[in-house]
Amino acid sequence: MKNYQRLKGLIAASFTPMDAQGKINLSAINKYADLMAKSDLTGVFVCGTTGESQSLTTNERKNILEQWIKSSNGRFKVIAHIGSNSQVEAVELARHAAEIG
């Protein structure tokens, strides 16, 4: 069983960066993560309502979470929003989040 810790400090609700055509800009997350790390945050909440979760596909949400974890480089916690109108998708997102950390 995992050892869970109580969260303390500021958790930012991140937006999902997109280009002019409305496609997700994963590379922008690197700069965004650097800014968050400099802001002395405890963590970021990824793909919540501020992050456009309801307008993204399950695969897009997975890719965004993976990029945030990579970009955070252990400097802050990354918390995944796994909610969905589909129970199957919510379970898939939860499993994915657990698998990648």
Regions found by a protein language model. Name each.
Residues 2-12, 17-101:
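Active-site beta->alpha loop and helix N-cap motifs at the rims of alpha/beta catalytic domains
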